[in-house]
Amino acid sequence: IYGATLVGSPFIGIGFNDYLGWAHTNNVHDGQDLYKLVLVDGGYKWGDDSKPFAIRTVKLKVRGADGVLSEKELTIKESVHGPIVREDEDYAYALRVVGQDQPYIFEQYLEMALAKNFNEFQKAASRLQNPFFTTMYADRDGRIMHLFGGRTPVRPAGDWDWLGTVPGDTPQTLWQDTHTYTELPKVIDAKSGWLQNANDPPWTTTLPRELDRRDYPDYMSRNFMHFRAQRSARMAYEDDKITFQELLAYKMDTRMELADRLVDDLVEAAESSDDKFLHKAAAV
């Protein structure tokens, strides 16, 4: 297995072997929620009743400037949502994050690295022990896959507004489960023969589109395609057969979609200006 580790990870996070390879990008993914709790009677409002906070103390070893370790106590206050990260006179804010009960990420990545075909790799990836990331896969048999991976909470309703502060005084907003592997957006063996992703949502990983956003909850991911992804998709879409050397050139491409759309208008505006400096800029 060859590849690179991600910062802080003692395993190959992006890699390849004699049979297949994979890479990751950041998926536009909401795997956490910040709940606003109403403080009452030393606890917090919960439906028509109230609940007390759970309080525990942990001991941490902290290395000082002199290199000596000292023991510090940290008091953690929790609601049913998760730990309290902020509190004022009337409200407290609790953070709920996916992945707290997924301790087998090392096993998953070892299985991915040892896989010899698509089925073996997919079996490993379907464990979803990594709470986020898009996975882009290709193998020597010509199979390709885009997986919008990680753990996405099964929310009762709503859209991307869950990215903001969520009312925490009702059981109706508290999610318990996450979407299964089969429920996540993915494109396997795209008809176009190519996939791309540049830290953007999964809907335009290939063109023509093979994912319909309406088949998924509105909170699954946002709906946009930024300029970097547009440039990536354009290069693949406009080339029927990409050679390895072309692929390397596309990888290092510095042309900007935004510039292509604005330069002509900017030059025209500069040339019509009374500012001689802008005339020089337009000439360049």
Predicted regions mapped to residue ranges:
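Mature extracytoplasmic enzyme cores
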Residues: 1-283
